[in-house]
Amino acid sequence: MGETTVLLHTCCAPCSSAIIEALLHSGITPVIYYCNPNIYPFEEYEIRKRECTRYAQSLGLEIVDADYDHDSWLDQMTGLENEPERGGRCLKCFKMRLLRTAQYARERGIKVITTTLASSRWKSLDQINEAGRWACYNLDGTSDLDAGENIPGTSTILPQNEVIWWEQNWRKGGLQERRLQIIKEYDFYNPLYCGCEFRLR
């Protein structure tokens, strides 16, 4: 990859734990970006943020809170309330969160982003990677979240990209096993759903 810093979009401490450890062991320092307007209720959002912060601080890492913007998220999900898991609502949710991640990376001068969502057994890696590529190619935010991928290849890195999407399957390489160990070591709160209120129905 060539970079020593990456902006890591983080959904919760358990999903991020082994990924952060692996990055550090590889000489890469993650800046942890907590951007999760999908999480409901607010108390759940706060618990997950607190656990992410606890883990980041234990490792001396920076964590950035993108603030809770659930109303905007609900507005974007209008009409998708009854979509199944891994359907159109998930893709749009990923796009919204990863676009904000990419835009923040550009503000900070961080060249590479990735997400802990790619460690979740509940989510589609294809959707996550589509959303990540789309976010990095549409940094100006003028493209509608409903638009298609709108980039010329599944793994193309274009010269106009100010931020690059790091496509990585964070479920492999022993990370799932290590994640379970870290959860026990830190006694993390371990969420049993992605955070979306519509998934609870």
What kind of feature is each model-predicted range?
Residues 1-201:
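Nucleotide-activated chemistry modules centered on ATP-dependent adenylation/adenylyltransferase
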